[in-house]
Amino acid sequence: MAPRKKAVTKKKTVEKSPPIEEEIIEEPVDEIVESDGDDKKNKKKGKRKSSKKSKKEKEENVEEEEQDQEEEEEGNKKQKEENDADKKSRKHDEHRKKRDSKNRRSHSKSDENEEGEEDDEERRKKRRRRKHREKRKKNGNKEEEEEEEQDDEHEDQNVEEDEEDVNVEKQKQQQQQSDFDEEEKEEEKEEEEEEEQIEIKKRSKKRNSIDSGRKDKSKKRKSKKKKRGQNDDDDDDDDNDDDDDDQDEEKEYEQDEDVNQESIVSEKEEEEDEEKQSQGSEDEEKQSENERRNDQDYTDRERERNRSRDRDSRDYSSRSDHRDYRDRDRDRSRDRDRDYRDSRDYRDRDRDYRDRDRDHYSSGGSSSSSRDHRDHRDRDYRDRDRDHRDRSRDRDRDHYSSSSGSSSNRRSRDRDNDSKRDEKSSSSNNSNNSTSTTSNNNASSNNVKIVQPPKENFFSNYRAIQSSIIPTHNKSKFGERILSIAPTEPPPNFQIPLSKPYRDDSLQQNNDNNNNSSNNNSNNSNNNFNNDNNPYNNSNNYNMNNSNTSPYNNSNNSNSNSSYYNDNDYNNNNNNNNNSNNNNNNNNNNNNNNNNNNNNNNNNFNNSNSNSSESKPNYFNNLSNVFNQITKPLENYKNNGKNENNNNNNNKNKNEDEKRIDLVQTKLSLKSSKSTPQTYNEKEFKVQISNIVVKKLKKYYKTKITTKEDFQYLGKKFTDFVITKERGNQTINKDSEKKIEKVIDNYFEKKEVYDRKKDKDYKKDDGDKLINSSIDISNDSNLSESSITITSTSTSTSTSALTSPKTTGTTTSTITTVTSTSTSSIENTKILVDDEKFKTNIQNETSKESNSI
């Protein structure tokens, strides 16, 4: 063998190597003895000792390696002998398995489990014994049975002795598990009986098909066995036994023919029963699937009904809410489309279309056939689109129609359609604008340019198209058709039917102002506020003082007197304390005066729950805003050197002053007013801010503000500060109160007690103006713990940006608050309003300080 030769060569090399090392080591020893010097001798001695130790270690290592190699060789020899024996036994076992599987057809795969080859042999022997016993019982040969049983026992003993020599280790394991083997054997016996019954049935089936060629196969088997017997001398006894078994099996086949017929009949009956059971189970499954589908359909319908009810119950109160609902509806429609897409009908129908396309269009052909295929395909696509349309229409009908609430469903559907239409129109306008800016202006381009029409076309100054405009020699059928379609009379003007006493007279006032503004800028006191550069141009808004629309007034007015006030701060020629009415026509007469004198009167506005019987209904609160929205875009057209509009405005009839505004514009303004913040006039804005400042300063009263005069001065100071910081912005948002509160808190954060005399901004000359003359302050009852009278004033000088440089004005608002020492909460707020005709005391109940913001 090759590995043995290598081991021998290693031994030779190891034997030659030590003497070479001895020669190398002996030479320096002689030199060391002859050399002088003690240091050198000591060093050489150390080297000599180390060399001797290394020599001994090497010799020991070589001996250990030789011993290991010898042990390995012996182990290899033993393993080879064992492997040879195992190979022989394996060959015999494999031969037996092949022979049994081909000839006997009795062993199933369950016999070849992990139990080992020994268990298989024992089973085979036991089966043989059982067969012989059954045969002998039939023949009545009991004596032979006893003899054969004894022979079998002797054979078993011999076999066990042979197996003990070969498989010593396996027997040790079996001895440890002897307790478990007995139980397993009992179970194995039961399994063997069941397997035999199954094998008998299988054999009966095979016999019917293999009766004709059985004899030929048996002859071939015998010839093969003879050849194998010559090659395998050790297995002669087993071969003889197998031949006997084959003969016995042939006899069994003849005896079991009757049994086979009965088994076949029984098997057929069992198969029929199984088929019936399988059919019954399939029917049950179909019924369960149908029930499940019906339940699903019912739940889907209920879901859709609930969705429609939820959608109808919503209130589209503002645009932001409407936008949210629109997004939700869009998501729901997508979910609904997905449900329909996943439904069975949809999938089956699309599958039919797809299969038809594959069958019709996949195969090629001539031009005529391809043309037919193309027509057929187009027809199919048309049918498919029609089906999609019908499905979407049915889906919308199911969505918007229900047993109850059909009108509300119709309303929600109309809302959805309106919103979609608005989106489409806005997108189309944006696309038109973008294309007009980006496209090149070529002379040959026939793009239609949309020019904004003049202001006249909005108001019944309509002219019919004249046929003389188009020249006669260039007339065509298309032009004649246009002239035949063109109207000859002006279209009807759809207007709001309002009675005269309740119409919006601000329109008349605006027309009067326009007539006067072309001649003089100083004719009216209101002309100072009609300029485009003036940020306080709010003279046209007369209906914005309604306490219902103001977020800062907590009163609930059912009448509209609070929405009208006399704008007397800027037109005081007639001494409004003597002659003032609540009628707008008188105000218009006052507005057209030529004097610019402004009297410093305390003109308090009406912000109350007035219970007057003669009050205007608050139907149209924001008509003036709508009119401004219509007229402002047309100012550019009017100012481009075209005086036709001015001439037309000057030559208008008196009936044109009583024009109404379209319904569509009013609806848009009413919707937009809900979401937009509240805007005020200059006078209103001052008073609203003073109210907020007083409300926030109340928190520091009696803690850091000790006197009433200090409180009044601080109210004036903070109102002026806020107005100057706003720089013409007269809108009050939700965040305005928070901003003012933050400013006041930062001011009092580092101060313990406030004294106005130490304040740099305070002037001694202004002390008399802080206190309102209409209130008696001399009494000490007003300064008691139970009630405190507070007046907050706001003044404007020529240097401030609140008014124009030519005019000065003062506004005051007197507020009476009743507070308690423990909670310091407002119980009542009184706004005293001085007017020529209306003098009322208003009480507004408010919540505690924590809930006031």
From Swiss-Prot:
Residues 20-37, 60-74, 112-121, 143-166, 179-197, 232-260, 268-286 have a biased composition (Acidic residues). GO terms for biological process: regulation of DNA-templated transcription. Residues 75-87, 287-361, 370-400, 411-425 have a biased composition (Basic and acidic residues). This is Uncharacterized protein DDB_G0283697. It comes from the Eukaryota. Residues 426-447, 510-613, 636-652 have a biased composition (Low complexity). It comes from Dictyostelium discoideum. One of its GO terms (cellular component) is chromosome. InterPro entries: SRI, SRI_sf. Residues 1-448, 485-621, 635-658 are annotated as: Disordered. Residues 1-11, 42-55, 88-107, 124-139, 216-228 have a biased composition (Basic residues).
